Design a protein with these regions (language model features):
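N-terminal soluble domains immediately following signal/targeting peptides that reside
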Residues: 5-127
Length: 127
């Protein structure tokens, strides 16, 4: 028998936090089925990263994610610099799949990427 979620696309909620080591982040991944919302507890995957603004120039060797229970997985990644990174989750179990999530990594925090440059300010015209 094949589990109901086996052929279902995966949804990954990723939270990364800076460690005491420069450019090293602890990432927690919560996996669920995209449609069913069911926890995926038996996945095997690696976490790698590419910098979308500089394709092929900056990428991180994938590291294995380790299950900590209830559909939660941990991976520690080391980046080359701060900025926007596309985290790539490459699955081998329950089936081959790829999930990509863009995050902005800074010295103090990690936040989801919304495609906007957060370094500029909007100026309002005063009439």
């Amino acid at each position: 028998l094949i589990p109901a979620h086996a052929a279902e696309k995966k949804s990954a909620m990723i939270e990364c936090t800076p460690t005491d080591e420069k450019l090293v982040f602890d990432c927690m991944v919560m996996l669920t089925g995209k449609k069913s919302g069911e926890v995926i507890a038996d996945a095997e995957f690696t976490v790698g990263a590419d910098m979308p603004s500089m394709p092929m120039a900056h990428n991180v060797e994938p590291v294995p994610a380790h299950s900590v229970g209830n559909g939660m997985y941990h991976a520690r990644i080391t980046l080359e610099m701060h900025g926007e990174w596309a985290l790539k989750l490459e699955f081998t179990k329950p089936e081959r799949d790829l999930v990509v999530s863009k995050l902005v990594f800074s010295k103090a925090s990690v936040s989801p990427s919304d495609g906007h440059d957060h370094k500029h300010e909007h100026k309002k015209n005063k009439d």
